[in-house]
From Swiss-Prot:
It comes from Rhopalurus junceus. The keyword Disulfide bond applies. The keyword Secreted applies. PROSITE patterns: LCN_CSAB. This is Non-toxic venom protein.
Amino acid sequence: KEGYPTNSEGCKITXLFNDPYCKGXCINLSTQAD
């Protein structure tokens, strides 16, 4: 996962674009507090 966004904002953004490298983190952060 190195080289890919792992912070909440980055994951939210990549999630919008369905980034497979951050999808898990995106979903994880989306279900948690903003």
